[in-house]
Amino acid sequence: MHASLDGFVGGPKGEMNWIKIDDELFDFVGKIVDQADVGLYGRVTYQMMESYWPTAGDKPNASKHDIEHSQWYKRVDKVVISNSMKGGKIPKVQIISGDINEGIGQLKQKEGKDILMLGSPSASHALMHHNLIDEYWIFVNPILLGVGIPLFKNIEAKVNLKFIASKVFASGVVGLHYEKS
């Protein structure tokens, strides 16, 4: 999850044009993404991803990152947290609605690699509320937004975290890795 130094993950209207992305960060995040075989999204982020990533790697001007992430996106199962998303069976997509504890609990019991949530602030807030996030990678960008969508919301009890690693990027972004202790 990208965040501003003052703790916002999006501007007041969800804007993300302030996020510093470059090849160094793409390569680093690509290694994290490769450790996952499930992409976890909120409905809005899933729809945004679905409109771009399935064909992003096929475009003539596709970057190395576009090709790699497009291949990953098409390969992995997607899980969408949504009470409003309806529709027929979508290949490689599972929708969790209603009891988020039960849905995520069942997902965590499955064999496989990591479950990775990219973005999805509303879904992240719901998972935080139920203390369902095991690890955090937060990429702090060198900007103060002042207002916007907060990184942390709906946390009702203290959650102890253990520092795992940090990474400073040439762009000024600092990656922070924590896990629940």
Q: How should each PLM-predicted stretch be described?
A:
Residues 139:
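Non-cysteine beta-strand/loop elements that form the S-adenosyl-L-methionine
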Residues 1-132, 142-181:
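Portal/gating segments that form or line small-molecule/metal binding sites
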Residues 135:
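Short, conserved catalytic or interaction motifs in soluble domains
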